[in-house]
């Protein structure tokens, strides 16, 4: 068993189903403190967070990630114990091996090797870790930790988020940004009545239908060189009882935007409200901004990562903003150069989640090389 797989074995053994950390961060903190890192816990309710830093002056490169994992689903469908790392034919199985305890193991191993190789390097190396990335408690995680760091005057120059960015092999895709995410819960009141007497009722389904037709056919924007066009999806509609002879008296609807840098949350809100106003409706709308879009399309970090990937796999990486949101959205607004570089995402959140030993070794070597370029060269 290699050093990386031993670290990964230890991390997988903690059943850290979001937002529970289950001991992962205690393990990581002890590991880093033994290397000379200064660590501070930034826990917030059920979510565990910590920041660790090695070095006193110079540019600060932070590796960010999360210790929480999604639920395993039906354990009987797994070929292995999801919380016990198992190797089969060069593949490593367990919940979180790809998303993203494999990256965490690479980060820890790289940090130990880097400090042993360069004990007095002219810069700072950091870790920003949360257990609140996978669930609804994300606001208690990285956003909270970043606020605390700002209050302490800690400024991050570069950040590598270890999310599983890769498609076929480690490094073939680097995420240089993510779309924004805006959700809305809409409530529209009508008047319940008998279907035989519609003139005595007010059907909210009929009232909202032209609004939905307008919103679902709307071209929000054309995207740009880095982002696809903004998309709106209706995710939930509920209209009360199940009786076939009752006109419902109320309607609840949820929708979500994934939006490009061509929009802001306020511009989207305005267009939704205007659509309702145009049809003389005044619903109650509860908005939730899950994250603004961010983009790192240039800079020292990106160039270092591109060159590193080219050196290790022989091709330049695809630069992408596809996929869901990540905690990079909470770090970039502080003026930080942010990219995502991690393992292959083909099996994340699935039964029999896995990664290859080769990909682990490649990722650790890439992390080491990037540190050399940013903190040594």
From Swiss-Prot:
Keyword Ubl conjugation: no
Keywords of this entry: Amino-acid biosynthesis, Cobalt, Diaminopimelate biosynthesis, Hydrolase, Lysine biosynthesis, Metal-binding, Zinc
TM ranges: none
Gene Ontology BP terms: diaminopimelate biosynthetic process; L-arginine biosynthetic process; lysine biosynthetic process via diaminopimelate
Gene3D superfamilies reported for this sequence: Zn peptidases
EC number: 3.5.1.18
Positions with a binding annotation for Zn(2+) 1: 66, 99, 163
Note on how the cofactor is bound: Binds 2 Zn(2+) or Co(2+) ions per subunit.
Cysteines engaged in disulfide bonds, as pairs: none
A GO MF term: succinyl-diaminopimelate desuccinylase activity
Cofactor(s), by name: Zn(2+); Co(2+)
A family per Pfam: M20_dimer
Enzymatic reactions: N-succinyl-(2S,6S)-2,6-diaminopimelate + H2O = (2S,6S)-2,6-diaminopimelate + succinate
Associated pathway: Amino-acid biosynthesis; L-lysine biosynthesis via DAP pathway; LL-2,6-diaminopimelate from (S)-tetrahydrodipicolinate (succinylase route): step 3/3
PANTHER family for this protein: ACETYLORNITHINE DEACETYLASE (PTHR43808), N-ACETYL-L-CITRULLINE DEACETYLASE (PTHR43808:SF31)
HAMAP family on file: DapE
Functional description taken from the UniProt entry: Catalyzes the hydrolysis of N-succinyl-L,L-diaminopimelic acid (SDAP), forming succinate and LL-2,6-diaminopimelate (DAP), an intermediate involved in the bacterial biosynthesis of lysine and meso-diaminopimelic acid, an essential component of bacterial cell walls.
Family note: Belongs to the peptidase M20A family. DapE subfamily.
Assembly: Homodimer.
Protein name as annotated: Succinyl-diaminopimelate desuccinylase
